[in-house]
Amino acid sequence: MFVHSVYFWLKPDLTEEQRAKFWEGVRSLTTIESVRQGFAGSPASTDRPIIDRSYSCALIMIFDDYAEHQAYQVHPIHDKFREECATFWSKVLIYDAVN
């Protein structure tokens, strides 16, 4: 199993239209064939000192293996998302894990 976790910090001055386009784009990533399971969401309302809720969107993708992740990275839907939405975030952090 290969888990790809992506955290986006959206720019504060985005219009509602730009935010909607971002969310539509990020959710489209979960439809890519090599994704076993995908989730895109906002920070939960949990409130403990150890929890970082500063991000705007968490994208969690589960793949069967690294090869499936690599197929996702070069998929046209992924390329379209980057092309159309990369200017919407000020910061992105990615954490990949395997077991």
Show which residues each predicted segment covers.
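C-terminal structural segments of small proteins and small subunits
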Residues: 66-92
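Short S/T/G/P-rich N-terminal loop/turn motif that feeds into the first structured element of a domain
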Residues: 1-56, 64-71, 98-99
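Conserved short beta-strand edge segments in small beta-sheet-based binding/regulatory domains
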Residues: 35-40, 84-96
